[in-house]
Amino acid sequence: MVMTDPIADYLTRIRNANMAKHTSVEIPASSMKKSLSEILKNEGFIRDYQVEDDNKQGMIKIFLKYGPNNERVISGLKRISKPGLRNYVSAENLPKVLNGLGIAIISTSAGVITDKEAREKNVGGEVIAYVW
């Protein structure tokens, strides 16, 4: 099967595992997905992730995070820039997700970073996804 949007697949797998209250989820690896996983970990949306090398593409195992009463930490994931309709923003027009409660993940010339980091560095780029 040919996958037309691997980032949407990544977000959907995390969303589905989160809704089913799984402790972890395995996703085919890529450098973009590793960057997204690092951002989710640094922002506190996932517990951890590890890259498992299988001498091919590899897999990323993401360990989901839940609150003390088993409530979900990730309440929403949304793909913004799609292969058929790319969404680019300038540094002045960087989006805020839920008035700063969520994050926007931006692919910039400085790498894949959050909207907060993009504001600090004063760079724009492609809006990959919103997470809240």
Swiss-Prot record:
One Pfam assignment: Ribosomal_S8
Which Gene Ontology CC terms are recorded? ribonucleoprotein complex; ribosome
Keywords annotated in UniProt: Ribonucleoprotein, Ribosomal protein, RNA-binding, rRNA-binding
SUPFAM superfamilies cross-referenced by the UniProt entry: Ribosomal protein S8 (SSF56047)
Question: What GO terms are given for molecular function?
Answer: rRNA binding; structural constituent of ribosome
Q: Which segments does the entry list as coiled coil? A: none
Source organism, top-level taxon: Bacteria
InterPro entries (alphabetical)? Ribosomal_uS8 (IPR000630), Ribosomal_uS8_CS (IPR047863), Ribosomal_uS8_sf (IPR035987)
Presence of the UniProt keyword RNA-binding in the record: yes
Quote the Gene3D superfamilies the UniProt record gives. Answer: 3.30.1370.30, 3.30.1490.10
What are the boundaries of the signal sequence? Answer: none
> Disulphide bridges in this chain?
none
GO biological process: one example: translation
In which family does this protein belong, per the annotation?
Answer: Belongs to the universal ribosomal protein uS8 family.
Note the subunit structure: Part of the 30S ribosomal subunit. Contacts proteins S5 and S12.
Entry-linked PANTHER family: 40S RIBOSOMAL PROTEIN S15A
Function recorded in the entry: One of the primary rRNA binding proteins, it binds directly to 16S rRNA central domain where it helps coordinate assembly of the platform of the 30S subunit.
* Protein known as: Small ribosomal subunit protein uS8
Tell me what gene encodes this.
Answer: rpsH
